[in-house]
């Protein structure tokens, strides 16, 4: 039976930057599940109202890129939670804990990987 690995990522692209080599090495040995907690695009815009349509297009594009990249490793078990980029520290911790707890209970991973606690990005620290 294959081991199960849960990847908890702040944004789409963090999983590839942090675990791309791991995916390649273990793609035939492990089953992967990826969680994206934030959408990863809106924090690039100061005026979120003015650029609302552009932001939504960027979020959708980023999701499509993540799905395409993960498909290379045959990873299709992916969840997007779309919290606002750069603001995970403002989401009540209990809400994030519930998301992660539910995913752990459903997927039952043997291994959980996430960002380093020394990462400077607030979404990654949260």
What are these regions (language model features)?
Residues 99-126:
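Active-site adenylate/phosphate-handling loop in enzymes that bind or generate adenylated species
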Residues 1-107:
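Active-site rim/loop-helix segments in enzyme catalytic domains that contact anionic ligands
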């Amino acid at each position: 039976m294959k081991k199960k690995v849960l990847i908890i990522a702040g944004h789409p692209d963090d999983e590839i930057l942090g675990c791309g080599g791991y995916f390649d090495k273990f793609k035939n040995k492990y089953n992967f599940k990826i969680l994206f907690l934030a959408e990863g695009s809106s924090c690039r815009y100061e005026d979120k109202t003015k650029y609302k349509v552009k932001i939504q297009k960027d979020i959708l594009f980023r999701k499509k890129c993540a799905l395409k990249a993960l498909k290379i490793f045959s990873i299709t078990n992916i969840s997007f939670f779309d919290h606002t980029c750069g603001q995970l520290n403002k989401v009540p911790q209990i809400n994030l804990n519930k998301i992660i707890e539910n995913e752990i209970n459903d997927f039952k991973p043997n291994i959980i990987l996430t960002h380093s606690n020394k990462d400077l990005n607030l979404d990654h620290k949260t």
